[in-house]
């Protein structure tokens, strides 16, 4: 089976590429900017998602059996600053990919977000009514509707939560951002009243490949880890995992954030019915933390900065 992954240079997209290779499938990896090497055989190819003709030509030439859309402008701040540009990727690009996939008979997996909800009645089922507070959530909800309107067969939309993992460039995930802030001499303020249900990208990518393998699983689903935690406590747990003094993180409140009304305070998921239909089991936060690695370019700094650097064994 030949599987195309869009957004291959991102945190989730790169994990999906690794999972595809691990399962023994043929990989077509595409990224908008950076080129990433996954093995001697597989490398990502630059493909502008806004170029309809080039996108169509590439997929008609390659004719993949499945397409996974991890491509998105996912920073709410970036979306707010450039909503029209974000719309081209988050909505128009997703709709275009769904249509092309349907035309060539490829199974289509589209990744969405917990930010389609307002956070007032967590935990959410996949059948609950969305009510996004910000532009990013509104765009992802629109992308869901566009994608699901293409066909009700051979297609799945998967909403996901806050992601833990190791990105190719070492700059995308929660722990990477925290470590880079500390390296620059900053102390971070994280909110103890902003609750999320983090998910491992490695675990999530296994679920995505299972969805590809299960053409009977169509429609809208939720996936996450199996525990809720505040952003503040997650930051503390990340520092403890790497033997760094947790006092480097300051406790704050989301209520003190400017425009906090546009940011959901409590987002968590009910994972059924998907959890009972796939072999992959959602991970605890402790299990997710064990997967995290220090980016290579930060390792020398980390050895000097951490109180107990020997608690971490590098895998590069």
What are these language model-derived features?
Residues 190-195, 221-228, 277:
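Glycine-rich Rossmann NAD(P)(H)-binding loop
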Residues 1-23:
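N-terminal Rossmann NAD(P)H-binding glycine-rich loop of SDR-like oxidoreductase domains
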Residues 88, 92-96, 116-158, 162-165:
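Catalytic helix-loop patch of NAD(P)-dependent Rossmann-fold dehydrogenases
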Residues 6, 30, 67-71, 108-113, ...:
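SDR active-site strand-loop-helix element
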Residues 29-38, 48-49, 71-72:
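N-terminal Rossmann-fold cofactor-binding loop
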Residues 207, 214-260, 265-266, 299-316:
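Mid/C-terminal beta-alpha module of Rossmann-like enzyme folds, strongest
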Residues 47-89, 100:
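NAD(P)H-binding glycine-rich loop region in Rossmannoid oxidoreductase-like domains
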Residues 148-196, 202-203:
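NAD(P)-dependent short-chain dehydrogenase/reductase
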